[in-house]
């Protein structure tokens, strides 16, 4: 299964549209968004996504109840929470925005997860720590680093591919 991974979209509509187009072209079945959508209006863009969404709230996401409601309106299978533990293709995932550093570190060290995915720092990370894949897709918006990125994880091969949005 292919999983699209993104974070820190920060209202950047052109890059959100590019990411959705890539995810649709790649036939991803699920998109993980690690938070910081920021404004509610960006959720409407995800109506064009041909996959369900697993998302976390970021520290810049305000209207949490409405955010959850709007995501559910797009697809009843969409979920959003502060921390998510989910199994996909026999892999155990922990997903968070990443602004609670101690929680992130505990998840990585716990031995409970195969994959830990987070955002918040806007810095790209792909590493293996004690048999745990640790992924930060960087920032979709490109505001801090100047390099807008998303990623695709192939769960069968356990391979991650970074994509720079141009």
UniProtKB/Swiss-Prot annotation:
<keyword id="KW-0479">Metal-binding</keyword>
<feature type="binding site">
    <location>
        <position position="10"/>
    </location>
    <ligand>
        <name>Mn(2+) 1</name>
    </ligand>
</feature>
<feature type="binding site">
    <location>
        <position position="122"/>
    </location>
    <ligand>
        <name>Mn(2+) 1</name>
    </ligand>
</feature>
<dbReference type="GO" id="GO:0046872">
    <property type="term" value="F:metal ion binding"/>
</dbReference>
<keyword id="KW-0533">Nickel</keyword>
<comment type="function">
    <text>Shows phosphodiesterase activity. Hydrolyzes phosphodiesters bonds in the artificial chromogenic substrates bis-p-nitrophenyl phosphate (bis-pNPP), and less efficiently thymidine 5'-monophosphate p-nitrophenyl ester (pNP-TMP) and p-nitrophenylphosphorylcholine (pNPPC). No catalytic activity was found toward cAMP or cGMP, nucleotides or phospholipase substrates such as phosphatidylcholine. The physiological substrate is unknown.</text>
</comment>
<dbReference type="InterPro" id="IPR024654">
    <property type="entry name" value="Calcineurin-like_PHP_lpxH"/>
</dbReference>
<feature type="binding site">
    <location>
        <position position="8"/>
    </location>
    <ligand>
        <name>Ni(2+) 1</name>
    </ligand>
</feature>
<keyword id="KW-0378">Hydrolase</keyword>
<dbReference type="Pfam" id="PF12850">
    <property type="entry name" value="Metallophos_2"/>
</dbReference>
<feature type="binding site">
    <location>
        <position position="122"/>
    </location>
    <ligand>
        <name>Ni(2+) 1</name>
    </ligand>
</feature>
<feature type="binding site">
    <location>
        <position position="10"/>
    </location>
    <ligand>
        <name>Ni(2+) 1</name>
    </ligand>
</feature>
<dbReference type="GO" id="GO:0016787">
    <property type="term" value="F:hydrolase activity"/>
</dbReference>
<feature type="binding site">
    <location>
        <position position="36"/>
    </location>
    <ligand>
        <name>Mn(2+) 2</name>
    </ligand>
</feature>
<dbReference type="InterPro" id="IPR053193">
    <property type="entry name" value="MetalloPDE_YfcE-like"/>
</dbReference>
<feature type="binding site">
    <location>
        <position position="59"/>
    </location>
    <ligand>
        <name>Mn(2+) 2</name>
    </ligand>
</feature>
<feature type="binding site">
    <location>
        <position position="97"/>
    </location>
    <ligand>
        <name>Ni(2+) 2</name>
    </ligand>
</feature>
<feature type="binding site">
    <location>
        <position position="36"/>
    </location>
    <ligand>
        <name>Ni(2+) 1</name>
    </ligand>
</feature>
<dbReference type="InterPro" id="IPR029052">
    <property type="entry name" value="Metallo-depent_PP-like"/>
</dbReference>
<keyword id="KW-0464">Manganese</keyword>
<feature type="binding site">
    <location>
        <position position="59"/>
    </location>
    <ligand>
        <name>Ni(2+) 2</name>
    </ligand>
</feature>
<feature type="binding site">
    <location>
        <position position="36"/>
    </location>
    <ligand>
        <name>Mn(2+) 1</name>
    </ligand>
</feature>
<feature type="binding site">
    <location>
        <position position="36"/>
    </location>
    <ligand>
        <name>Ni(2+) 2</name>
    </ligand>
</feature>
<feature type="binding site">
    <location>
        <position position="120"/>
    </location>
    <ligand>
        <name>Ni(2+) 2</name>
    </ligand>
</feature>
<dbReference type="InterPro" id="IPR000979">
    <property type="entry name" value="Phosphodiesterase_MJ0936/Vps29"/>
</dbReference>
<feature type="binding site">
    <location>
        <position position="97"/>
    </location>
    <ligand>
        <name>Mn(2+) 2</name>
    </ligand>
</feature>
<comment type="similarity">
    <text>Belongs to the metallophosphoesterase superfamily. YfcE family.</text>
</comment>
<comment type="subunit">
    <text>Monomer.</text>
</comment>
<dbReference type="InterPro" id="IPR041802">
    <property type="entry name" value="MPP_YfcE"/>
</dbReference>
<protein>
    <recommendedName>
        <fullName>Phosphodiesterase MJ0936</fullName>
        <ecNumber>3.1.4.-</ecNumber>
    </recommendedName>
</protein>
<feature type="binding site">
    <location>
        <position position="8"/>
    </location>
    <ligand>
        <name>Mn(2+) 1</name>
    </ligand>
</feature>
<dbReference type="InterPro" id="IPR020935">
    <property type="entry name" value="PdiEstase_YfcE_CS"/>
</dbReference>
<feature type="binding site">
    <location>
        <position position="120"/>
    </location>
    <ligand>
        <name>Mn(2+) 2</name>
    </ligand>
</feature>
